[in-house]
C-alpha cells in the first residue's frame, strides 16, 4: 500500500464505528505476515467485546492480540525481530500512547494504529487527533448511515433506542446494540434538558 523503506513510520486508520477499522488493521497485519515480517498486535484491556485475546472485526475476522492496561506496557512485549507494531482501539489508551507510538516509529518500526477519530458527540476522541497529526499515512474510513444510507462519518450512541445525551459518559464499550453509524445529518446529540 505504501512505499516500503527501512525507516519507521506511523499509519492511522480511523473513522466511525462499523467503518471497517479493525478489519483494515487485520488486513494490513496479515499482509505483513505473508511478506515474512514479524508483527505484534495490541489492544486495550477494556476492549473485551468479542474476545479478550484477539482483535475481532464486526464481521468476524480476527488476529491474536496482547491486551495491555497502559500504553507504556507495550514496550515490555517488543523484541528486536519485530517489524510491525499494530494497536487497535487506540482511542481507549492513556495519553502516553502518542509518545509510545513516536518512540516505536523512531526506532524503525512500522506502527499501525486504528481507532475512532470522534466520540459519540462528534468531537475529537482521545489521542487519535494527535496521532493523525504526526502520522505519515492517515486512512479515514466511512460506514453506511443506518438511518438514510449515506456515507457515515459519525457514531450514534443509543440508550434504550434513543440518542444519548451530550453529557452522558464518553466511554461505554459496546457493539450494535448501543451504537450505529450515522451521517452528519442523521446524527443527533440532545442535551439532557432536551430529553
Swiss-Prot record:
One Gene Ontology MF term: thymidine kinase activity
Gene Ontology BP annotations: DNA biosynthetic process; thymidine metabolic process
Main location: cytoplasm
Binding, Zn(2+): 145, 148, 183, 186
Location of the active site: 89
Gene3D superfamilies cross-referenced by the UniProt entry: 3.30.60.20, P-loop containing nucleotide triphosphate hydrolases (3.40.50.300)
Stated family: Belongs to the thymidine kinase family.
Descriptive protein name: Thymidine kinase
Protein source organism: Bacillus thuringiensis (strain Al Hakam)
Designated gene of the protein: tdk
Amino acid at each position: 500500500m505504501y512505499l516500503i523503506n527501512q525507516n519507521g513510520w506511523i499509519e492511522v486508520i480511523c473513522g466511525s464505528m462499523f467503518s471497517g477499522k479493525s478489519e483494515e488493521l487485520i488486513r494490513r497485519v496479515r499482509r505483513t505476515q505473508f511478506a515474512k515480517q514479524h508483527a505484534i498486535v495490541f489492544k486495550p484491556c477494556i476492549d473485551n467485546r468479542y474476545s479478550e485475546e484477539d482483535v475481532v472485526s464486526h464481521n468476524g475476522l480476527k488476529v491474536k492480540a496482547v491486551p495491555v492496561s497502559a500504553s507504556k506496557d507495550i514496550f515490555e512485549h517488543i523484541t528486536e525481530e519485530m517489524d510491525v507494531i499494530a494497536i487497535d482501539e487506540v482511542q481507549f489508551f492513556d495519553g502516553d500512547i502518542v509518545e509510545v507510538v513516536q518512540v516505536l516509529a523512531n526506532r524503525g518500526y512500522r506502527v499501525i494504529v486504528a481507532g475512532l477519530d470522534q466520540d459519540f458527540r462528534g468531537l475529537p476522541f482521545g489521542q487519535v487527533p494527535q496521532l493523525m497529526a504526526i502520522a505519515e499515512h492517515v486512512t479515514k474510513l466511512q460506514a453506511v448511515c443506518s438511518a438514510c444510507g449515506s456515507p457515515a462519518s459519525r457514531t450514534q450512541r443509543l440508550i434504550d433506542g434513543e440518542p444519548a445525551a451530550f453529557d452522558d459518559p464518553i466511554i461505554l464499550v459496546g457493539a450494535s446494540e448501543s451504537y450505529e453509524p450515522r451521517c452528519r445529518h442523521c446524527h443527533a446529540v440532545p442535551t439532557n434538558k432536551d430529553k
